[in-house]
Amino acid sequence: MKTGLLLFFLFIITITINAQGVIIGDISVSGNNTTKESFIIRELAFNKGDTLSNTELNEAINNSKQNIVNTSLFNEVNISSNINGSIANISIDVKERWYLWPIPQLTIDERNFNTWLETGDLSRASAGVFLTHNNMRGRGEILKVLFMLGYNQKLGLSYEMPYLNKKKTFGMGFQSIYTLKHEVNAVTEKDKQVFLKTSDHPIQRDWTNAIQFNYRPKLYMHNTLQIRHHLWEFSDTLVDFNPYYSPKSTTELQYFSIYYKLKIDYRDYKPYPLNGFYTDIEALKTGLGILNNDVNIFSLKSTSRKYFNLSNNFYAAVGLIAKLSWGGFQPYVMERGLGYGRDYIRGYEYYVIDGQDYAVIKTNIKYAIIPKKVFKLNWIPTEKFNTIPISIYLNVFGDAGYVNNNQVYDASNKLPNKFQYSGGLGIDLSTYYDSVARIEWAVNAMGESRIYLHFIAPI
């Protein structure tokens, strides 16, 4: 009886201690030689003067650390509290990354690394320089400059300022990119891209300019609005080869588009999440009726991902992607079904599934063979490069999807309008400077089994 009473009183005391409030006092930041202190404080889940219980304080510190890590500006982030009476003073220590990267580029004009491995054709390579600065003026502003020559020629410039106002909720940016191609994906046959090449003149030119507005009223909510101008030029050879490539086989196309994206992001680590969730909604109106053209397409797309910590190094994830389109005919150059970017079914990397509407579900269960470990290379003098995190996961997955295509250009394409699915095993590596590498074995609904390489998180 006495033991029971003692445990009861200890339980009450514990609850009372955790419920007692502390007031956030001074907030200090160290290690930020480049990054402005105000940029770091913007990511905190608490403010000076807030009253929090001990439990709430610990949770807020953990969430704040994740937010700062997810800026991708720091190798390490540590947050500690010093409680003196009812006042909790907060100390934040960061170790900054290297921000300026003049990177030589050798790119292959393929949808993914696996499709290039199928042929190993280096004649489709382009070389150049990609210059990026991820923390201009110490405010998280991003400058990108691209200069490419070779198979495809490309010039690009973009600048993004995440915050312009005192509350750090409103930002702007712009981008401009010019591309000249001698070979393009002109049509799809047997569910694979068919390329058309011209040697004596460019087969396609395109120039896209955009202005962007960002609004972030809350820590985990992002709004993006873009107004874009597009100018395309197609060779006669291209539109003769595929009359559906552009609207009414035109050789010149110019139009405006408007794009909006709402994103809610509670992932613990964006490059390779293990806990939390992510969801977004995208709306794109192509053709605003301002210029004389025949483009009038509206699409809605949504992506949702949920990540779970099951127990003792076991994790699970599920992702759903869905897209709907309206507006009638979609020229081939604008039509995007599955097989592009992150919208694909594992096991179908060598295929594209054309269509106007689609849905994909992806599932994973993984085991941490090597949970996150951080190695210090002491022979490298700077902390910007001597901190190497490594984690390795065994991954079991299953995907399924469906593409609706009511614009059938070629009867040899059998994958649209049919349920597709796959499953497999993989090994994932998450490491240096947010890098991810995956090797997977997958079998699809056609019974094909292959090994694939990827360099982005599976879900």
Question: Where do the language-model regions lie?
Answer:
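Gram-negative/organellar outer-membrane beta-barrel architecture
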Residues: N89, V94-Y259, R267, G337-D343, ...
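Outer-membrane beta-barrel transmembrane domain signature
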Residues: A368-V374, I380-G423
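Outer-envelope exported proteins of Gram-negative bacteria
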Residues: V94, Q226, A317-I321, N395-F397
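Bacterial Sec-dependent N-terminal signal peptides
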Residues: M1-I23, I459
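C-terminal beta-signal and terminal closure region of outer-membrane beta-barrel proteins
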Residues: V408-P458
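Periplasmic polypeptide-binding modules associated with outer-membrane biogenesis and secretion
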Residues: Q20-N112, F130, K144-Y163, F298-S304, ...
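Short glycine-rich beta-strand segments
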Residues: I177-K181, E282-L288, K323-G327, N395-V403
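C-terminal outer-membrane beta-barrel translocator/porin domains of Gram-negative envelope proteins
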Residues: Y255-T387
